[in-house]
Design a protein with these regions (language model features):
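Helix-loop "lid/cap" segments that line or gate small-molecule binding pockets
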Residues: 6-13, 36-51
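Short, surface-exposed alpha-helical segments at coil->helix boundaries
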Residues: 4, 39, 96-100
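Short, acidic loop-to-helix structural element flanking the phosphoryl-transfer center
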Residues: 39-40, 44, 48, 59-90, ...
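Short, basic/glycine-rich phosphate-binding loops at helix/coil junctions
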Residues: 50-61, 102-107
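Active-site neighborhood of HAD-like aspartate-dependent phosphohydrolases
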Residues: 1-23
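Substrate-recognition/cap helix-loop segment adjacent to the acidic, metal-dependent catalytic center
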Residues: 76-89, 93-117
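Helix N-cap/beta->alpha junction signal
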Residues: 72, 92-94, 144
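Asp-based, Mg2+/Mn2+-dependent phosphohydrolase catalytic module
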Residues: 104-140, 144-207
Length: 207
């Protein structure tokens, strides 16, 4: 939804040509970094168009975006529900400023009692995750099959991967062809409220 809202805003504020240029920069940066960086793309846009009088307005739009209104239905309920299984932790990829703000503004930070880690590439930081949050078994929920596959390759049977087919990445045909299916595929994040716990934890006591 943020993509549609920002597209509409850019189209109105800077015009269709510059709107398309912003998204070209955004896509290039996402390919380079591996995550969506809206402010980083705006910084690069600024270098290309340093005299654009709308830059401040676009920055204000992003910083004050109502992320809490854009969560998937029942997402916070799922976070609270997951705390019955064990400690719920947000593992996120992103920049060091905007991503933490998104997590806080959406209400997720308080829902997980501030248990949040923001990496550049979280699938490369599993040793740090294990040190901070040791467990016999992990459950990883992500809409990127690439991430789920990479973590499964490293943790093996110690992790149950869950793939909600919801969001920008979830229906990427190339990813669906390239990577193996997750341990559990669900239609939407809210489905986790009714998933039997035995499908997530292979043996009693693994929490």
């Amino acid at each position: 939804r943020i993509t549609a809202d920002l597209t509409q805003y850019l189209d109105r504020e800077v015009g269709p040509a510059h709107e398309r240029e912003y998204w070209r920069i955004f896509d290039d940066l996402r390919e380079e970094l591996g995550y969506a960086d809206y402010l980083g793309a705006l910084q690069r846009y600024r270098l290309a168009y340093p005299h654009d009088s709308h830059l401040l307005a676009v920055s204000h739009f992003l910083v004050n975006y109502p992320f809490a209104d854009r969560l998937f239905p029942r997402a916070l309920d799922v976070v609270r529900h997951a705390r019955q299984w064990g400690r719920a932790v947000i593992l996120s990829d992103g920049d060091a400023v905007f991503q933490p703000r998104k997590i806080e503004q959406s209400g997720i930070l308080s829902a997980v009692e501030e248990q949040v880690l923001v990496y550049v590439h979280k699938e490369q930081e599993l040793e740090d995750v294990e040190q901070r949050y040791p467990a016999d078994h992990y459950v990883l929920i992500d809409d990127k099959l690439r991430i789920l596959s990479a973590v499964k390759e490293q943790w093996g049977a110690r992790v149950t991967t869950v793939f909600p087919r919801q969001g920008h990445y979830a229906n990427d045909p190339e990813a669906l062809r390239t990577f193996p299916p997750a341990d559990l595929t669900i239609d939407c994040i809210g489905d986790l409220l009714t998933v039997d716990q035995s499908r997530l934890f292979p043996a009693a006591g693994h929490r």
